Every structure is written in C-alpha cells, then in structure tokens.
Amino acid sequence: MRVIQTALMLCVASTQLCNAAGLERRNIDTDFLFADGMVVDLGVGSVSPSFTATQGGGFAFESGKNVAPSFSITTGSFKSEISDKLDLGIWHTTSGNGVNIDYGSVTGPGMTGAMNSSMTAVTNSGRIKADVSLPSTLLAAKYQMNDNWSLIGGMKYVSVSGGQLMLPMDIDGRDPATGAINPNGDLLIDTTSVWNFGSTQGTGAVLGFAYERPDIALRVSIINEAKIDLSVPTTSGGGVAANSNSEASIGDATTLAFQTGIAENTLLFGSVRRSNWANNQITIQTLGGPATITDFVDGKNYTLGIGRKFSDKLSGSLSYYYSDGDGDGASELSPYGDTKTVSLGAKYSINDNTDVSFGLSESERGDATTGNFAAKLTGSSVTSFGVKLTHRY
C-alpha cells in the first residue's frame, strides 16, 4: 500500500493553495519527507479571489470593485535519503504568508484647515491598499526510530523583502461637526498615509512525530510550528513618523494529520490545524504612537477527503475544508468570516519516475463587516488552481 499512499497524497497536496487564518496563504508541508529515495518537485498555483466592499459606517467604497487582486504561488521541494533511518529535505514557497488588498478610493468624513477649533468638516477620499508577500522555507529532517515511529524536526525561515501599505488616517482625531477633539474616537479621513517596508527575516523551530503502518497506508502525524517575530524597517509619509519599525508575527501552529487505507486503492485523509493569530497582530507607527491595524482571530480549520487510484497511471482526490471565523469586526486586510472549500485533485504518471498533479479548489468566504471602516463584504469567493511536477531519482 505504500506506493498507493504516496501517489494519492501527491494529488491531494496539489489542491492546497490558499488558507484562511491571519495572513496564511500556503502552510508548510512535511509530507515530502515520507517519499522513497531522492525526490524533487515544483508546483505553481493561481489564486483568484472575488471580494466586493459596499458602504458602511459613513464610508463609501468604489462600486463593483474587486478589492482582492489575484496572485500566484510557486512551491518546490527536494528530499534525499541519507540512510535507512535519516531523510533530509528543503521545502520552499514564494508566498507562505501575505496580503494583497486594494479597496481603491474610500470616501468619508474628514477635516480641513489648521489644527484648531476653526477646522471645518469636509468629505475626503483616501485609499486602503496592502501588498506584502512573505516567502517561507523549511529545512527539515525525518529520523526513523523504528518500523512505526519517526521523529521530524527542522527550522522554518520567513522573510519580508519590500511591500507597501496605504491607509486613510485621522491625524488629530477632531470632531467633523465642531472641530473639537473627538471624544468618541470616530475615524476620519484627513490624509492617506503610506508605509514602505524594507527587508527582514525570522526563524522558528518545527518539531513533530509520526506513526505509520505501511501495510494499511496508515500515517498519523502531529507537527508544531513555533512563533516567528518580525520587526520590519519602515519608511513612511503622510501624517506619520518618517522612519520606524513595523511589528508583525507569524503565530505558532499545530497540525494533526492522518491518512489510512479504507479499501483497495482507496485512501481516507484529513487534518485539524490550530494557529495562533489573536496574539499576533500587525502594529505600525503613527504620530500618535504605535497603532494596531489588524484584528486577526485564532485559526481552527479542518480537512476531510478521499483519494482513489483508478489505474497504474491515474489517481484522484476529493476533499472538503472548513475554517471557522467571525466576520463581525474583521480586519480590513482579511475581510471575511468562515471558509468552506471543495477541492479536486488528480495525478497522472508520465513514466515510472515522473508524475504531474493538478488541483482545483472553489472556496466560499463568509460575510464580513470590517472593524475600522465598516466595509460590508458579501458573497465572497476564491478560485484556486495548481499544477505540480514530481520526479524521482
């Protein structure tokens, strides 16, 4: 059953392109360490969201604009069998975490004039935009302790290299009706501030273990990823400090995954993942001091699917993914509630050493109202497609 197990999981992996919690896009994958011999693979994916924001809380958004542009992800891995007990490998993705949001012009109440009681209320326009991508690299080893148990360990490396954030800012917090200091702290649009991010990186440990019974294609694994802190050099303008550091974290996460044969040439698989984002918000510097611009919640997601080997050359999979979430007060950078995804995967063996895998996912995102500008988003969806080439030496 080991050959069947490996073949099916190749097509399953090709469907896992976009995740839901915090800034997650493509979580690290340790399954490649379980392949036999020396293996290299390369995959590319396209993610096409459809998010439209409508008016709320006194702010107006561009009608019909898709606020979440499409993006692509490239993922690759290399694994070598050092001995009967030890495997070493490297896994990389161009966008393990990230955000690509552009609400365009946002119109709402603001102030003009000198910063005193003579200021007058006006209608101003600002812009909400964020474009940041965080590549992830995993260096990992698997040590086979006995016929059933193996130990997995390594380091995850996350980097930032450029990116930009644009937000409408309330410079002095004055009431638009009176010009007095606004006691309620209602958000106004006085200007659009811009933060340009520099380069930084961080590392975190990855530890876990797995139990296997190859005769029934059973594998159960638990993997823990440590938190990674990032202090990003930032230059900015438009009513904010000119030079500063922005603070962000990739929260710790634990993934429990399983797969088992349930009939000849048929595999049942699933996972439960818990990621910590509530304590890992993004903080930027303004004239008034540090400001938290996100309202991430902890991620809890579940996957269940079935894989089937149809012939020596063709295998397929079908899976369902669910991630809970509350759309009330959502972050402008991740404006959705829960996530429901159906994925299809297929793998075709070109020859004895080379496979090509395809994946297609259709995701429904729950309705949301963002916390700061009260943007209302309904009927949001994401379509993802990926292809992966695998070669064994």
Describe the predicted segments one by one:
Residues 21-23, 55, 82-393:
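Outer-membrane beta-barrel porins/channels
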Residues 1-2, 10, 143, 187:
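Residue-level marker of intrinsically disordered, low-complexity segments enriched
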